[in-house]
């Protein structure tokens, strides 16, 4: 049992866990088991498709699991870093994102990446996300700009 007032967060994988060969049923069962063992919330690996978050939350609810699932956002500030992180995590980069990033010069990648992350964050919040988790990659400036764009800072 977990002490009263103490919360435990666990990982969730909208694109599938890299070690599970993208077996959504297995990933969902593991996440549901984490919740049944006392997890208070889940934070996802970064991803780029709001439908995947909605499907994950819906599938958990069908299993009777209603913990908050906080989506992970990776502000794209560097193309090389994005590709490396996607390879390591098994996260897919939608054509719509890749096309926008690949259509600009390296010096504009961060600007467009912030636009993409802002739009994605807006979609997630509109879909009911309980909050957002940013993978800052030691670059809090981009996250600060996204929060300003969302007009959620106090």
Q: Model-predicted segments: where are they?
A:
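Aromatic/hydrophobic pocket-lining residues that form the small-molecule binding cavity
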Residues: 27, 31, 53, 113, ...
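A structural motif corresponding to the C-terminal end of an alpha-helix
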Residues: 1-6, 37, 119-131
